[in-house]
């Protein structure tokens, strides 16, 4: 399943290379994911990336959770980076197949000389069985502690820019001062949604 929402804007998603620390939480609706059959095994997730400069861009100490949800149509208002809510017990109880697929590993994007735009695959090392007609969530905490110099050379995610009041489909934050705890309550940002592909067998 390829969900290309748009290519009109680049953002620091799914990881920020220009700040020491950051998070991205992404919500994709059941309708958007409807092509994936019930019982499918999810093998990998890809993000559409633009990298002006070629080379390998590594980030250390990455923490990524994926899950579906039984009742949610958007993220709760008090979403934590790890996918839980600080206040919404129904949200917490209704998560499906909540799986941490990266727990401190190094992830890297290798950008070719050409083309600048590519899909970057992220393997799902743990078994993840799909439940049809349910939304899909990805929560990502970058605890690398360093940044990639340059304002335009590092990889950035492509997606659609949004305006006005939007559902809580994307949470985003970045800073240089300190690691974000996994229980940090996120900032909901209605201005962007990243493109993704989901592969299954």
For the regions a protein language model found, what residue spans apply to each?
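Proprotein-processing/basic-patch segments
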Residues: 5-7, 18, 134-201
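A short beta-strand-loop element at or near the start of a globular domain
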Residues: 6-53
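Ordered hydrophobic segments in well-structured contexts
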Residues: 4, 24-30, 44-48, 65, ...
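Aromatic- and Gly/Pro-enriched, solvent-exposed loop/edge beta-strand patches characteristic
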Residues: 57, 61-164
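Compositionally biased regions
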Residues: 5, 17, 35, 47, ...
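Exposed, polar/acidic Ser/Thr-rich sequence context and nearby capping/turn residues
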Residues: 1-11, 113-115, 124, 146, ...
């Amino acid at each position: 399943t390829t969900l290309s929402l748009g290519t009109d804007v680049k953002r620091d998603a799914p990881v920020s290379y220009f700040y020491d620390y950051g998070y991205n939480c992404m919500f994709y609706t059941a309708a958007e994911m409807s092509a994936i059959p019930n019982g499918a095994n999810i093998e990998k997730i890809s993000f559409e990336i633009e990298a002006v400069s070629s080379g390998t861009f590594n980030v250390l100490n990455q923490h990524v959770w994926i899950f579906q949800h039984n009742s949610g149509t958007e993220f709760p208002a008090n979403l934590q980076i790890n996918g839980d809510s600080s206040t919404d017990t129904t949200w917490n109880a209704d998560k499906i197949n909540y799986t941490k697929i990266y727990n401190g590993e190094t992830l890297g994007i290798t950008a070719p000389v050409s083309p600048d735009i590519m899909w970057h695959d992220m393997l799902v090392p743990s078994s993840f069985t799909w439940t049809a007609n349910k939304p899909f969530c990805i929560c990502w905490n970058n605890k690398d502690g360093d940044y990639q110099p340059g304002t335009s050379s590092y990889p950035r995610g492509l997606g659609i820019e949004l305006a006005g009041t939007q559902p809580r489909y994307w949470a985003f934050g970045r800073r240089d001062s300190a690691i974000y705890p996994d229980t940090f309550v996120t900032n909901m940002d209605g201005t962007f949604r990243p493109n993704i592909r989901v592969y299954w067998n």
